[in-house]
Amino acid sequence: IQDRLFTIGSSLAADPEKSKMKIPDLNTEDITLLEKEIDIMVSALPPLKSFVLPGGTLLNSHCHVARCVCRRAERLATGLSESEWVEPMVLIYLNRLSDYLFMLARHACFVRNITETPWRPRV
């Protein structure tokens, strides 16, 4: 994941028209790997019946913070794509990575027998 984030940074920082360097790229295998890992975690977890509040443990909280940062990066990259060329795989990868981080947070609670806190909206 860290290597792919550096790849994304290279892609977003470089001007493909002016760059003389070969820019690393993402490929479908990178996304497929995330999706496979998500599927493995989903198969072990109970289904969600409501939204869950972030938190529970330090690890779980870190996963949720990382997910929020990833979502923000996705929104910024999407906004950038409206005025500049952005490799489509970058947007797909960031979207799947945030899903992966959400499942990782849930999985971290599950393997430690920590009950997730459901969101109970005031209505």
Please give the residue ranges for each predicted region:
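Phosphate/pyrophosphate-binding loop motifs in nucleotide- or prenyl diphosphate-using proteins
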Residues: 1-123
